Structure formats: structure tokens, C-alpha cells
């Protein structure tokens, strides 16, 4: 089975789009980074290294130090799919990130986005 194209897309090429989406709604790059680090376990320096290396999404998530256990609390629909029902773990992680960035752009408070 072929991998979805997004997995071979570099994280660095999509990252600015996440920041741009947040910025358009008055949110910050720092908030985007906080979300990414919360979900993946990367610290700020490791996140920047992954961006600088141009790793693809598959590698980005495969090398993530630890997916936050509270990611299981992320529910809802993104790209027409319920994130909690996605059976492919790499795709589910990607959709978790999409969902959280979407919530940020919709003005949700960080405490709720980070499932605190």
C-alpha cells in the first residue's frame, strides 16, 4: 500500500503554514511551538533541528521523543475524519497535530488545547 503523500512531505515545508494559520487569527509562533512540543516531546532546540534537517512527517513523528499520553483526549473531526477513530498510528498523530493547530486558530485557550 502506498503511503499518503503527506508522510513524504517535509515537516519544514508545512511548519510555516501552521504558524501562518495561527498568526492570521492573532495567535503566535510560540503557541504553535508549544503545541508541537507538547504533542511530540521535542524540546524547542530539537524541534528546530528537525525543521533545519528538513525531515519528512513520517520521520518527524517516528523520531519524536514521546507522544504525550494526553493526546488520547484529543477528539473531534479534522479533514473529514474523527481523530479518535483513525486506526493508523502515524496518521492519527498527524491529525492530532492538525486538530490542535485548528483549535488554536479558532481561539481556544491553550489550557484546553493542551488538555490540562
Predicted feature residues:
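A charge-rich, low-complexity, intrinsically flexible signal that marks solvent-exposed coils, linkers
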Residues: 1-116
